[in-house]
Amino acid sequence: MFLTRSEYDRGVNTFSPEGRLFQVEYAIEAIKLGSTAIGICTPEGVVLAVEKRITSPLMVPSTVEKIVEVDKHIGCATSGLMADARTLIERARVECQNHWFVYNERMSIESCAQAVSTLAIQFGDSGDSDGAAAMSRPFGVAILFAGIEAGQPQLWHMDPSGTFVRHGAKAIGSGSEGAQQNLQDLFRPDLTLDEAIDISLNTLKQVMEEKLNSTNVEVMTMTKEREFYMFTKEEVEQHIKNIA
């Protein structure tokens, strides 16, 4: 006898007869409720642009961080449950530091994404052999990793299933479907960094419900000459004027 749909819904480590893990699928759907984040990789560097949702005038916008530094050569943008994102970002930072201490070299972006994905898939009904408690559900967050490795810009995407893939351009979050289509139409492998910034902001402008301004968007660039660099409000405003 097969279990009912609701029973497969509750089990995070039980496949349905169709070969599906419903809790992982639901976690992926949860990301579509999060703010939109866009990453574009160019020969000059990588751009991350993220929507910041200020849900109350009493909130302090500067405390809502959507783009964070993992290491000097790796930054990431997240969409989904922020509490889950902080846990995964903390793991990424620890792994990068451990790699530096042990091997005296920077961790590759792919290895960093792989280390985070290893934690992301450690959900189930029992703990591991070391006695650590297992998580009761998948992480409801997707991450865009942007970095420089051997002088080459890279962009990686990881979702709640633990799958991590390298991209030329990628959109996640509530406006990801429309944004992804726009990126497919406009992306070229030979884009300049400024063109990528304008495309990312223009794409956010199309999918965001609010009017684009320097308060509700964050922009970060990663280049060989200047690694993790967060744009100031004035710089963001200038680029918004360029696409007006």
Swiss-Prot record:
InterPro entries, sorted: Ntn_hydrolases_N (IPR029055), Proteasome_alpha (IPR050115), Proteasome_alpha-type (IPR023332), Proteasome_alpha_type_5 (IPR033812), Proteasome_asu_N (IPR000426), Proteasome_sua/b (IPR001353)
Keyword Iron tagged: no
NCBIfam families in the cross-refs: PRK03996.1
Main subcellular location of this protein, as a coarse class: cytoplasm
Pfam annotation, one family = Proteasome
What keywords sit in the KW lines?
Answer: Cytoplasm, Nucleus, Proteasome
Where's it found, cell-wise? Answer: Cytoplasm; Nucleus
The scientific name of the source species is Drosophila melanogaster
Q: How does it assemble?
A: The 26S proteasome consists of a 20S proteasome core and two 19S regulatory subunits. The 20S proteasome core is composed of 28 subunits that are arranged in four stacked rings, resulting in a barrel-shaped structure. The two end rings are each formed by seven alpha subunits, and the two central rings are each formed by seven beta subunits. The catalytic chamber with the active sites is on the inside of the barrel.
Among SUPFAM superfamilies, the record links this protein to: N-terminal nucleophile aminohydrolases (Ntn hydrolases) (SSF56235)
Family the UniProt entry places it in = Belongs to the peptidase T1A family.
Query: Gene Ontology terms, cellular component aspect?
Result: cytosol; nucleoplasm; nucleus; proteasome complex; proteasome core complex; proteasome core complex, alpha-subunit complex
Function noted in UniProt: The proteasome is a multicatalytic proteinase complex which is characterized by its ability to cleave peptides with Arg, Phe, Tyr, Leu, and Glu adjacent to the leaving group at neutral or slightly basic pH. The proteasome has an ATP-dependent proteolytic activity.
Disulfide linkages recorded for this protein, renumbered to the chain, are none
Q: Know the name of this protein?
A: Proteasome subunit alpha type-5
Q: According to the UniProt entry, where is the signal peptide?
A: none
Q: Which GO terms describe its biological process?
A: determination of adult lifespan; proteasome-mediated ubiquitin-dependent protein catabolic process
